Amino acid sequence: KTVKTTLGIHTCDDIDGFDVDHPDFLAQGMSADTTEYVSIHAALNGTIFFILSETGELHKYNLSKSFDFRTATYENEFALNSEINSFSFSKDGTRLFALNAEHNTMELTTFSLSSPFNTSITPTQIHIVDLSTIGIDLVDGENSSATDVEFNDDGSEMFISVFNQEGDVLERIHQFSLGKNYDVSTASHIGSVGM
């Protein structure tokens, strides 16, 4: 199969990677203004993947071949808050979690999706949890930012990585136990480890 681009005609063998800034993908709906991507998530055995831009746009792609980004087609964009720098989904795809990256703001927003991994219908915000009230300490004079959120397979455990620009330990991963799977409002802090 050949691909016609502004740079000429190429065979699929010439495509070594997946470039979301490539004109062929921009033509599918990706904004040309987006310059940096901060998080990625694959779902449904690699047939769907999401990319989060630095400005908080969550872009969804469908893949006709699992984990082969060369087979991707653009589906839609869901605009999150511009401070969001990380996201995750529940295993069944009915919950979306968005982590605020603003300095000294440790908020995790939970959204409900109308159907698994469906961001074409605006997700409904369920709640926002201030992680500094349930175990992540903010130290005066230090610029801490939450950088990633992940869950174990069944959603009974949550992990938040935090970057601290001025402390002795620059990275710390916090572990939380969830009283109800994938319900961040039931989180209790277990501990943390410095990296």
Residues covered by each model-derived region:
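Residue-level detector of Asp-centered blade-edge/turn motifs that repeat once per structural unit
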Residues: L44-N45, K91-D92, D153-D154
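Beta-rich catalytic cores
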Residues: E36, E83, S145
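Short loop/turn segments immediately following beta-strands, especially the blade-tip
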Residues: K4-D16, N62-R70, T110-I121, F176-T186
